[in-house]
Amino acid sequence: MSVLRRIPQDGTFHQEGPIHRLAKRRPRFIASFDLSAATDRWPVPVIYELMACLFGQTMASCIVNGALALNSCSLKSVTGRHDEVVFVAGQPLGYYGSWALFALSHHAIVWLAALRAYPHQTRPFLDYALLGDDIVIADRSVAKEYRSLLDALQVDISDAKSIVSETGCLEFAKRFWVKIMSKDLSPVSAKAVLESYFLVGTQQLAYKYKLSPKTCLRLNKAGYRVLGQMDTTLRPYPGVLVGFRRYLVSF
């Protein structure tokens, strides 16, 4: 996990951080791929080779083979025969190192795609954002090579859920961004709106979505008369008004 923390394009510790960095580069072409059951279909040899390259074959055997490839279980088939089954793809549920292993190997695939697209480039490829199986690539050639690599690994990409945009639109970590990632058009959950009828819920909603005081009052069924006279009573006391607003809408 400490390795992931050092990769600016990884969103494990800050989900929106890679998107904000990518937005500063103002890319037009963006490919936001949705991987179908990636954690179930990701090949174990890919993870093993990456760990062997980073930490040596002995450590890779302990981390990967000891927990995945050599960890067999007996299953009873429909014919009544007991068969020994081992992992050749995917990862077991609850495995402690699952996220880090998958994320690191996913980064390696993106880097390999960049190397295949630009074999003579010496600078690291930075035009992407990654969070687990969420991937955004802001380079047409690298996106093409990435798709080719996943086809070779037999990891499917859902075209119906993927977004290939020429105007900077993408979906990343359940958030939908448009206009070169400058506008967040992600929907607000109905649960959050219903909880806004309580003061604590209103504060949380205002803090998360940066709502104005008038918007918060409208969510609590305030009419135009209330909104028009918001400042009337406390107008002689601007300091009190500012403090009261801050208390209502944010901490």
From Swiss-Prot:
The protein's name is Uncharacterized mitochondrial protein AtMg01110
Compartments in which it is found: Mitochondrion
Return the Pfam families for the record: Mitovir_RNA_pol (PF05919)
Q: Does the keyword Cell inner membrane apply?
A: no
Q: Which InterPro entries match?
A: RNA_pol_mitovir (IPR008686)
State the UniProt keywords alphabetically: Mitochondrion
Any Gene Ontology CC annotation? mitochondrion
Please give the superkingdom of this protein's source.
Answer: Eukaryota
Misc. comment: A stretch of 270 kb of the mitochondrial genome is duplicated within the centromere of chromosome 2 resulting in the duplication of the gene. The expression of this duplicated gene (At2g07749) is not demonstrated.
